[in-house]
Amino acid sequence: MQTLDLEALAAHRGSLFGAMPGGQPSQKAFESRVHDALSRLDPARPVVVEAESSKIGARLVPPSLWAAMAAAPVIEIVAPVEARVAHTVATYADIAADPAALDLALSRLPRHHARATISEWRAMAARGALSDLARQLIEVHYDPAYRRTGADRGRPVLDRLVLEDLSPAALAIAAQGLAAGLDRARDPA
C-alpha cells in the first residue's frame, strides 16, 4: 500500500497540539519534500493520505494535491472513544510531558470555546488528568469541528474500518487488510 505522510513531511501533526521538536520546514522545503515523496510513488496504484486540512501547522498543502485529496474517495476509520482517548494520550505524550507547551496550546482555543471550558481543560492538564482532557477535546472540540467542516460530505466511501482499539498492532493489522482490499479492488482478477 502506498502512503503519503503529509504530517511527517510538514514536521507537524496538524492540530494546535501538533508542533514537533525542530520546527517545520519552510513552505518551499515542504513542497520539495512532497514532490520528492510523490515522485517515488507508482502513479498507477492508489495512494492513501490521511484527511488533512489544507494547512498543516503553518504549511499549506500544494493546491493541486489538496484538490486531488478533496475529490478522492474516503476510507473511514471508526473506533470507540476509549480507544481514541488512549491513542491520543500516547500520540501526544511529548506535549503532555511539557506542561508549558500544553498550556500554551490550550490557551489558543478560546475563540472556539467558552473561557470556563478552557479553564477546566487547563486545570485538567495541570493536574495530569490527560485521559480526561483527551476525552473532552475529542468530544467537545475535535468531533464537533469535524462535523461542522463536513470535509468528507458527498465523497464516496471506499471502505469503513471498525477498530476496537488503536494500538500499533491493531493499526498494523488494519493496514494489512486495507492494503489487500485496495489490491483486490485494483486487480479484481
Label for each model-derived stretch:
Residues 69-72, 78-189:
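Conserved NTP phosphate-binding and transfer environment spanning the P-loop NTPase/kinase superfamily
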Residues 2-68:
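Conserved nucleotide-sensing/catalytic segment adjacent to the nucleotide-binding pocket
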Residues 4, 75-76:
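Short hydrophobic alpha-helical runs that function as membrane-insertion/retention elements
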Residues 47, 74-75:
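Short, well-ordered beta-strand core segments
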